[in-house]
Design a protein with these regions (language model features):
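Sec/Tat signal peptide C-region and signal peptidase I cleavage site
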Residues: 15-19
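Non-catalytic propeptide/linker segments at domain boundaries
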Residues: 115-182
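Sterically constrained small-residue positions within well-ordered secondary structures
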Residues: 10, 24, 66, 106, ...
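Sec-dependent N-terminal signal peptides
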Residues: 4-13
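N-terminal prosegments of processed precursors
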Residues: 20-113
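Conserved small/polar residues in nucleotide/adenosyl-binding loops
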Residues: 185-191
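Short, flexible beta-strand-to-coil junctions
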Residues: 80-81, 131-133, 186
Length: 192
């Protein structure tokens, strides 16, 4: 019994020591990556459109290199120096659904896709992969993100849409604020 407890304790300590620390690899900012998925049902391609920096990160900070859900696409962020996976997420896109239509057999189209990733502290490689319904890789694309790149647009600090909190349950690290539009104008909203 003592031996089983020792082995179990060893595995628990080992699992905890492997956990990534968000602050080791990422800043409290968001990297917005805009891609264009193009093609038809026979051939697909991914193109990088634009990179933007947003003022804060509101996503997960734990289990960063694990997939939260299975999708028909993945984004993998690797530290450029060590090649270690530092962030991974999955998605499903309208482009991949469109590929199963009759229109995709006859014509090629492009679909815009935007993804929000944690902003890396050091240069990182971002890989995006599209899978078929049978989980075969259809196409993939890799690019390097250098956090100090002057071509990364800084957004979200000016020209911010006017807003006010009706209820603020806590800070953004612990709470999610949900806004439900109901077609009010600034003239019909009560002022307090």
């Amino acid at each position: 019994m003592k031996q089983i407890c020792s082995i179990l304790l060893f595995f628990l300590i080992s699992a905890g020591s492997y956990a990534q620390n968000f602050a080791d690899y990422f800043q409290n900012k968001t990297l917005r990556v805009d891609y264009i998925f193009t093609g038809n049902n026979k051939q697909q391609a991914i193109y990088l459109d634009e990179l933007s920096q947003l003022p804060s990160w509101a996503g997960r900070e734990h289990h960063l290199s694990e997939l939260p859900l299975e999708g028909n696409g993945q984004i993998i962020v690797r530290d450029l120096a060590t090649r270690q996976c530092i962030y991974k997420t999955s998605f499903s896109s309208l482009f991949q659904e469109w590929l199963s239509t009759d229109e995709a057999k006859e014509t090629a189209k492009g679909f815009e896709n935007t993804f929000l990733l944690p902003y890396p502290k050091q240069p990182a490689e971002v890989e995006i992969v599209l899978f078929s319904p049978r989980k075969k890789v259809m196409t993939s694309f890799k690019h390097i993100v250098r956090p100090d790149d002057i071509l990364i647009h800084k957004r979200g600090t000016s020209h911010v849409t006017p807003h006010r909190y009706i209820l603020q349950s806590g800070n953004e690290k612990e709470c999610i604020d949900v806004a439900i539009p109901v077609s009010y104008t600034h003239l019909t909203l009560p002022t307090t």
